[in-house]
């Protein structure tokens, strides 16, 4: 990984030099409020409105849990500067299971029969079983956990990682621009990339699907293999083109790119989920998705 989280002494050394931040850290409350509203707005007249509204319910349950049960200060002094909260190696607090219980409690009254069955399964699962499923998901062994359970477990894990990311230094610098495929905070996958407006006008940031951080990657470069060749942009509606898929002919992957200048309310997770028909189109063209949406997990192996 090529983005380093700076210590306090390193922050002081670069304090007088301005450059676009390599990493943007989320504002938890604002993020969940914006995402839930965007999901509900996108659900209007959408063929998959029921699922978008279900996703909005989960996001609102994350917000409610955040407000009722915030993460206490963690012992984070001896972390690596590179991927300090690495999803595969960081020793997580068991409070994430409390978050899962609270999220399930929030969703249960609104659940249909299928979702209710998933909630019941997770409520009856032992702590060891929940931790095992979490380990598989964090190791990116997504095919080993059924997608209906993964959505809830990931929502709780993400709420934990998002808050943990608030407790580490928030300054960073690029050490090597060639290896930016995974989140420099937790090592997880991107959901999509977003081209910013405002002080970061025109810069592209990838959005993490776990800790919700964003990291800068130059445009016209594959987000999966660094190739500058054989890149193409696709969209279902060229007139609007708020959400496009950037495909790479070198590694045959794709990741969506969104443009705030076309809609300042665009939100990576919500708009990625709502543009699932673009995913279908890309897969039909032979491209594999290089990122992961926290509401769309691969099917479990039979």
Swiss-Prot record:
InterPro entries: FdhE-like_sf, FdhE_C, FdhE_central, FdhE_N, Formate_DH_accessory. It is found in: Cytoplasm. One of its GO terms (cellular component) is cytosol. Keywords: Cytoplasm. Belongs to the FdhE family. Necessary for formate dehydrogenase activity. This is Protein FdhE homolog.
